[in-house]
């Protein structure tokens, strides 16, 4: 609220209550789903523009499709491989993309794909993730705690403009001391 002198005031108790609510819905060890807007097709209004479909994601280099991005650690734990299909809750199937740097217990899926009647010859491109957004307290968050996954034993090839030179089996970050480097430069 606002004080009489015009200065904005915040209730610290309300902030603590909000943080406690977020922690209570996170589910601890459960998987979380993060839905995001794709850089090229946005919400999907322009999904029928092939120029936008051809524009690869700046991080994954995937174009013409969306996918479920998972961390290498989660992929290993769930025995998932690149381009294997999975279902998230009852959504999908959607191909997996193992993404270094992805948060461990988080799956990310881009919105804006799977739109019907957009002038695309075969009908759709990708999967529409909009049905996954659940209304809570009148809002529609793009974060869903406590999701489940189910493997579909089928592979699906993603269109990528580059699939080499990403990590080449190395750790995400490498650090050393001068002494270690001089002893073993590899």
Language model features with spans:
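A cross-kingdom feature strongest in bacterial/archaeal respiratory oxidoreductases
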Residues: 1-186
